[in-house]
Amino acid sequence: MKDIHNNIEFENRDSNKKYGTLYGIGVGPGNEELLTIKAVKILERCDVVIAPTAREQGESIALNTAKNFINSKAEIYLKYFPMKKEKEAEIYENYRFMEKLLSEGKNVVFLTIGDPFVYSTYIYLLEYMKNHNLNIETVPGITSFCAAASLAEQTLVIGDEPLLILPGNRLDSIKDEKYLVIMKYYKNVEQVLDKLEEKGFKYVCVKRAYREGQEILRTREEILNSKD
C-alpha cells in the first residue's frame, strides 16, 4: 500500500494481532489548566506518549503542557516530524515506529498543541493510520486563536458572517471578509499589517496565549517591536 502523502510503500496491518489504540490529543494553547478532562483521563492510563517536534533536537510545548498528567509508567518519545518530501525516509521511520508500538497492544498518545485538526502534524499521521485500518480516537483541544480571542476579549465572528482562517503567506485569499484569523505570520509580519490596514481592518495580535511571556498587542508599533 502507498501512503497518499509521501508515496512510500507500507506493509498492511496484521489481522492476527490485537492492536492498541492511537489517541490524537490536542492539549490546547499550552497551559495545563486548559486540557480537557477526557485528555487527562487518557494520559493517566496510556502506555506510550509521542510528542512531535518541528526541529531536530527541539523541545515540545505539547509535552511540557501535558507532562504532569502522564501515566508515570508510560514510555515518552520526542520525535522529529518534518513534513517535507525530501524527508520521506525519516517520516517513514516515525510512522513505522508507532505502528510497531500499536501492534504490541500498547495504547499510544500523539500530542499536538492546539487542536489536532488545525495546522497539525497529526493530520498527516491520521491519513496514514486510516489507510492501515488502525484504531484511532481523536480528542479535540482549544485552538490558539480561540484562546487568543478570549484573552483579548475580541469577537471572532458573529451572526451569519463567515470567518476566514489563513496562514500569513496566503494574504491573497483575503477578499471581502469582515472577520479574519491569521496564523503563522511571523516571517512576513509587515506585509500582514500592510494588508490589514489596506483593507481597513482593526486588529489585535496575541502571542504565546496562556503561556509564560504572553503578549496582547494592539498597535502596529507594538507588534513590530515585539521580540519573538
Predicted region positions:
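Class I S-adenosyl-L-methionine
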Residues: 1-32, 37-134, 220-222
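A contiguous loop/helix-start segment that scaffolds small-molecule binding in enzyme catalytic cores
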Residues: 22, 174-228
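Well-ordered beta-strand positions
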Residues: 46-48, 154, 179
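Structural signal for conserved beta-strand scaffold positions within catalytic alpha/beta enzyme cores
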Residues: 51, 77-80, 138, 158, ...
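Short gly/pro/ser/thr-enriched loop/turn and capping motifs at secondary-structure boundaries
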Residues: 56-59, 84, 143-146, 211-213
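A short, acidic, amphipathic alpha-helical segment used as a generic capping/interface helix at domain edges
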Residues: 97, 101, 167-173, 187-192
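Class I SAM-dependent methyltransferase SAM-binding "motif I" and its flanking Rossmann-like core
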Residues: 117-176
